Amino acid sequence: MLRGVAGAAGLAAVSGGLLTACSSSDSSDKKSGGSGGTASVAGSTVTFGSNYSDPAAKTAFAALTTAATTSSKVKVTVNTVDHNTFQDNITSYLQGTPDDLFTWFAGYRMQYFAAQGLAQPLDDVWEKIGGNFGPAAKQLSTGLDGHQYLVPLYNYPWVVFYNKSEFAKRHYTVPTTWDEYVTLAKKMKTDGLIPIAFADKDGWPALGTFDILNMRINGYDYHMKLMSHKIPWTDAGVATVFQHWAELLPYTQSGANGRIWQDAAKTLEAKQAGMMFQGTNQVAAQYVTDKANLDDLDFFTFPTVNPKWGQDYMDAPTDGFMLSKKAKNTDAAKAILEYIGTGPAEAEYLKTDQWDVGLANGLQVPTYNAIQKKSVAEIGKCKAVAQFMDRDADPAMAKAMISIIQKFIDDPSTGNIASLQKSAEQQAKAIYTS
C-alpha cells in the first residue's frame, strides 16, 4: 500500500459535547526554525481533534504538530480524546462544533463522512503533496466523488507477535501453515503457556481475526465483497471462517470479552502467553509504553490456511488526517496538512513512533527498528491489503459484527454459528438497503 507496500499491485481497492468533555488540550507553538508558512496564515491557530490517546502515540503526535508549527508558523492546539470514545462519537462530533482538523482512517471510513458532507475536499493540498505519494495512497485518500479528503501518515500490519527468547528457549518453530499453527498452540498449552493472548472488551480487536481468517480461507476479493454485502453472511465461506476460528478458540486466552487488548499484550510481555495476533500499532506500542524489551519482540505473518491464497493478503490499516466541514481556519489547517504530507514530516513523527511505517515516496527513516523494517518488507510482499472490517464495511455493519463475534466467542458451537450468520445477514440487508 502506499509507500509501505513498496508498489504491490491490487492494494486496498479499496457528540461534540462528549468529546470536548473527555478531551485534554495541548498547544504547539514553537517559533524557531522551519520554512514555509505564508504571511496570511503565520501566527494563526488551528485546533486538531486527536484520537492518539495512548501515551506513546500521543508523544509522537505532539512531535509532529510541533514540527508542523515550526514549518508553517501556524499554532496547533490538540484536543486529545480516548481512542474508542472518539470513534464512538465521531458523527455527532462532526455535526456539532468539531476541531478544524481531525485524525481518521483511510478507505471507506473516510469516504463515508466525505459523502455525508462532514469533511472538506483537499484537492488543492494534494496538488502540492501528490508527488510525495504513490497512486495507492492517493486512492485510499479519495472519496466516492473523486475528490481527496485525507492526508495519510502511516500504515501498519496485523501479524502474530512472539518473544524471540521464548521461542529459542523452548525450541519453537515459526509456523507457516494452519496445521503447524494449531500444533504449536497445543504444544504451548502443554508447556503451561497461554498459547494466544486475546482480548475483545473494546469490540474491534476480534474483527482483525475474522478478517485474516476470511482472507486466508476465501481470498481478498471474497472478503471485500462480503464487506460490501455483495456476498451474503449466510454463505458457506463465512461458516468455514467461524469453524476454523472455533478450532483455535481453546488455545486463546479465556475471558476475552472482559479484557482490553493492552492487558492481553502485557501477558505476552510477561511471557505468560506465547503469541498474540494484533497490529504493530498496538502490541509494539504497548511494549514501548511499558518499557518492555522491544528488541525481543518479533512477528510472523498469519499462516497459510488455503494454499490457493497462501499469505498473499493482510490487514494493513492506513491512518491520516481530515479537514472538518465546519473548520474555522481552513487556510491555516491546509498549511498544516501540506507539511504533514511530506517525507520529512513522516520521518519526524516516526522518530518517536516505533511501531508504524510511513507512506511517503523515498522516505528515509534512520530510526526504524527491526519491527518497522520487517513491517515494510512484509506489507510489500502482499498482493493486496485490506483496511480492517470497521474501515472496509459500513460502520453500522461493523458495529453489528462486534456484537455477533462477541457472542461467537462465548459460544462457538455449530448451531450458534448458523444462528449468528442469519442474524448478520438480516442486519446486513437492513443496513445496505437503507
Where do the model's predicted regions map?
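Extracytoplasmic/periplasmic substrate-binding proteins
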Residues: 51, 109-111, 243-329
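A structural signal for short loop-to-beta-strand junctions that line the ligand-binding cleft
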Residues: 99-100, 130-165, 194-197, 310-313, ...
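Conserved C-terminal helix/tail region of periplasmic/extracytoplasmic solute-binding proteins
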Residues: 168, 381-434
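Hinge/lid segment of periplasmic solute-binding proteins
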Residues: 107-158, 209-211, 298-299
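Conserved N-terminal structural module of periplasmic/extracytoplasmic solute-binding proteins
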Residues: 3-111, 116, 257, 292, ...
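Extracytoplasmic/periplasmic solute-binding protein
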Residues: 149-153, 158, 182-230
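Glycine-centered hinge/linker elements that transmit conformational signals in sensory
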Residues: 187, 227-257
